Regions:
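Acidic donor-binding loop at a coil-to-helix junction in glycosyltransferase catalytic cores
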Residues: 147-153
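Catalytic donor-sugar/metal-binding loop of nucleotide-sugar-dependent glycosyltransferases
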Residues: 156-172
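Short beta-strand-to-loop acidic/aromatic patch adjacent to the donor-nucleotide binding site
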Residues: 2-20
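Terminal low-complexity segments of carbohydrate-biosynthetic enzymes
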Residues: 176, 182-242
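Short, flexible, basic/aromatic active-site loop/helix in glycosyltransferases
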Residues: 68-120
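Conserved nucleotide-sugar donor-binding
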Residues: 113-114, 118-139
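Short, electropositive alpha-helical surface patch
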Residues: 24-25, 33-38, 42-43, 58-83
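Conserved donor-nucleotide/metal-binding helix-loop-beta segment in metal-dependent transferases, i.e.
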Residues: 14-53
Length: 242
């Protein structure tokens, strides 16, 4: 085996492109396998893009469903380089918690080499391809028992690896509300996914437990000197916000 491509079972090879302010969507099929194979030979890792419901955090009306400052503290307590308060709030305010595809990227434009940002070279665990011929540049996947974050810990050990960002999308159906997409049943619009749905609530709770369990190890790896201070800060934020 030369290459290994990760593809989550709640992701589909299409891009959702928003048409203007009305929110009608153009769906564009994506050739994920071919696109990764095109670039992986000259890389250690290739990583694509996600659109749709890119995190298991449901939509909430800030200061109506929940106090914004408390929600901000919660997100900060579980955040990493990929999930941050700024990115979550922007999606809520701009597009009801949905990430839409960039048309140029969906058309295969814009490949580039992704560089280490100081604490790692950040990737996520799907639309992720590994070059097994460069096994010395591929760190292990690991997460604490019952936790999330195996792609996060993988990322912090990619500092000396060559990562190519490839212009191809997966649609992430994080709440399994659009499984018809695999049969090319494409909705004209995407709806807000709220926590009032019991299945959505349980998905969010499970994800939250996983984030809380992995955060101490992430803090230790990325900032040992301030570990005790940051763990205490996180604990206080969780105590106030949960």
């Amino acid at each position: 085996m030369d290459y290994l491509l990760f593809w989550d079972d709640d992701e589909y090879p299409v891009a959702c492109i928003k048409n203007g302010e009305k929110g009608d969507i153009t769906w564009k099929e994506q050739d994920n396998i071919t696109m990764h194979l095109k670039y992986i030979q000259d890389a250690d890792v290739t990583i694509g893009y996600h659109c749709g419901y890119t995190s298991p955090i449901p939509y909430v009306e800030l200061n109506e469903d929940i106090d914004e400052n408390l929600f901000k503290e919660y997100i900060e307590a579980i955040s990493n380089e990929v999930v941050s308060w700024e990115s979550i709030k922007e999606k809520f305010v701009k597009d009801n918690g949905i990430t839409y595809a960039d048309p140029k990227i969906a058309n295969g434009e814009g490949v580039y080499e992704q560089k280490d940002e100081g604490n790692g070279n950040w990737v996520v665990g799907s639309t992720l391809c590994l070059n097994l011929n460069h096994i010395d540049k591929i760190p292990a996947f690991y997460n604490p028992e019952g936790a999330r974050g195996e792609d996060t810990f993988f990322s912090v050990n990619l500092k000396d690896s060559k990562i190519i960002k490839v212009p191809v999308y997966h649609f992430h159906d994080g709440f399994l509300k659009y499984t018809g997409i695999v049969r090319k049943q494409y909705p004209r619009t995407l709806k807000k996914i709220r926590a009032s749905d019991e299945e959505v609530e349980q998905r969010f709770l499970k994800a939250s437990r996983g984030w809380i369990r992995y955060k101490p190890l992430l803090l230790y790896i990325t900032d040992k000197e301030k570990y005790n201070i940051k763990v205490k800060e996180n604990y206080e934020k969780l105590k106030r916000s949960i």
